[in-house]
């Protein structure tokens, strides 16, 4: 809890994966990928319950071994590669409310593909949201340079470079550009009532919580897995 408010952490983990077979339970530094997010959630000083939403009995068993609650097996219609994550989150919240009479003031989404995000990151994000009276949601963001619009170009039909607005390309000094950020995907936090009503974490009352770029690495294919494992070994993750 935080300031008397209850917090739930939800880890969505379906069985299917096109980029990396059995992605959510692929070994990473001696643990299944999903274990890193479960354990980070359990170590958070603010999260009261960590649950895993999955359509797989195997993933459910592994999640339980690492301490997560698995109160249901996700319905097949919510486990396709086109299912919006928000539908999975809302389903979990409604199940707990209707079947177990459990309600939480804040909801934290922890994608299992972001194993570099730890409990300190989670707690910083939760506290930032709770401490900001004017906000009802928060998402993790990272500063980007290579993808800054100032450095992006288009191509004409004849492969000549064009500015994004079809104008002449003008050289830009890195020191002159404004910072821009991307949604880095490792953490989403929201007031639960607002989340259910809006069905999104991103709206005009959403804060950005800045994370270093290396924290934003996601495991979606074998190349990602190799890079993330190298970082973990270098930084001596627990």
What are these regions (language model features)?
Residues 58-108, 123-127:
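Short phosphate-binding loop-to-helix
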Residues 44-45, 66, 132:
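Structural motif
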Residues 7, 48, 69, 105, ...:
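Conserved acidic residues
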Residues 55-58, 194:
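Short, polar loop motifs at secondary-structure junctions
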Residues 2, 179-238:
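Conserved alpha/beta core of the MobA/IspD/sugar-nucleotide pyrophosphorylase nucleotidyltransferase superfamily
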Residues 87, 115-205:
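Conserved core of the sugar-phosphate nucleotidyltransferase
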Residues 3-53:
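N-terminal glycine-rich phosphate-binding loop and ensuing alpha1 helix
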């Amino acid at each position: 809890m935080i300031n008397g408010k209850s917090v739930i952490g939800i880890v969505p983990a379906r069985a299917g994966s096109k980029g990396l077979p059995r992605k959510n339970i692929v070994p990473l530094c001696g643990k299944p990928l999903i274990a890193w997010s479960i354990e980070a959630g359990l170590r958070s000083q603010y999260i009261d319950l960590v649950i895993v939403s999955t359509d797989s009995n195997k993933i459910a068993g592994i999640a339980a071994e690492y301490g997560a609650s698995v109160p249901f097996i996700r319905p097949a219609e919510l486990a396709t590669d086109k299912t919006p994550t928000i539908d999975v989150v809302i389903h979990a919240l409604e199940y707990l409310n209707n079947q177990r009479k459990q309600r939480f003031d804040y909801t934290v989404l922890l994608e299992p593909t972001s194993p570099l995000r730890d409990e300190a990151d989670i707690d910083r994000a939760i506290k930032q949201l709770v401490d900001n009276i004017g906000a009802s949601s928060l998402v993790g963001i990272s500063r980007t340079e290579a993808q800054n619009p100032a450095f992006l170009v288009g191509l004409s039909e004849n492969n000549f470079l064009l500015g994004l607005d079809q104008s002449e390309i003008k050289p830009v000094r890195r020191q002159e550009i404004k910072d821009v950020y991307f949604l880095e995907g490792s953490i989403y936090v929201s007031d639960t009532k607002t989340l259910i009503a809006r069905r999104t974490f991103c709206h005009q009352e959403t804060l950005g919580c800045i994370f270093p770029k290396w924290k934003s690495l996601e495991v979606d294919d074998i190349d990602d897995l190799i890079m993330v494992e190298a970082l973990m070994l270098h930084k001596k993750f627990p």
